[in-house]
């Protein structure tokens, strides 16, 4: 486990009509994070089975914290600590986010984030606390052997963007966090 990464497992109430749950409470996010997180934008992406997006992050002054959840389908979500001064530098966590389990993953600034789609398709929503800046965007190779990430790819067929195919391994990455 990496203490700064927070997995929210909301309780939801089901009955004959369907279900209800609080999908977002700013005060609970702030309390769990230990500081005021100011989400300013919400993004949504839809991907098909085998699509791998990651491992992405942005440098200051556009670094981003994220709150990620699956609206449809399921993904294996991965987060890597890329803060050089951290005791958990280079370590990662993985968890399955599904539309059914309604888990949400809080990813603070200073971490690389990515996911692979496990279901036929998946729709992911993520709130961010800073705007996208292409000049500040960076990535880490998803298949960096030193990280030892198990992507649970049974057939080794993945779909990557050209940009993600060219990300450096962590050891060769110059632009990280202190």
Where are these regions (language model features)?
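Non-catalytic, conserved peripheral segments adjacent to functional cores
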Residues: 1-100, 119-121, 128-178
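Short beta-strand His + acidic residue motifs that chelate non-heme Fe in jelly-roll/DSBH
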Residues: 105, 113-118
